[in-house]
């Protein structure tokens, strides 16, 4: 039976400011990528999100980002491999400690925003993240795009969990269409469902050019900060289960 994990970025509120639809989304996912205080989140939010994930039997993931609260971690910064190593160890270690304090355990790591982009294309920064995760806990998989970070993850002896998106279009090389370009986002739920079905069952995705591109789909990312995200997640999960696709943590 084909299967897929469903992950969502969570815990991205900060103080009284609320981001995302965490409560509504939690029942529809199998893994939560929890912000660790650098691009979003704070200790109280991290703790509350970990508790909610444990209560819902959702896997707990660390979601480290660049130190950029104002830019939500989406602005590219000039960072060195040593800086990326340090900020990754710091954030992953913090969430790991919170999870343990509540009787849970850290399940995976997924980088956020600009750090995700940088590690997809820069082998040195990708290796810095992989080395940091391996040094914290070599049993932790990393959720990756099929890019530099995937190779670095494998070379460090870690498991690479390949991530796909329902609401993003793809290019001929298997990369996501940049958000700055037309048709980068897929807003029609039926189109998104059809795309995910093919990725899971056939291992291909239809690029914007019309070309079918090979793709590995281990985990599906749902964007929790989009309007109607909870309904979107519920409909996608129901459609996949109706196709005989098992929804489970990797």
Swiss-Prot record:
One record GO biological process: carbohydrate metabolic process
GO MF, any single term: 5-oxoprolinase (ATP-hydrolyzing) activity
Top-rank taxon: Bacteria
Pfam families per UniProt: LamB_YcsF
Top EC class, one word: hydrolase
Function recorded in the entry: Catalyzes the cleavage of 5-oxoproline to form L-glutamate coupled to the hydrolysis of ATP to ADP and inorganic phosphate.
Protein name: 5-oxoprolinase subunit A 2
Gene that produces this protein: pxpA2
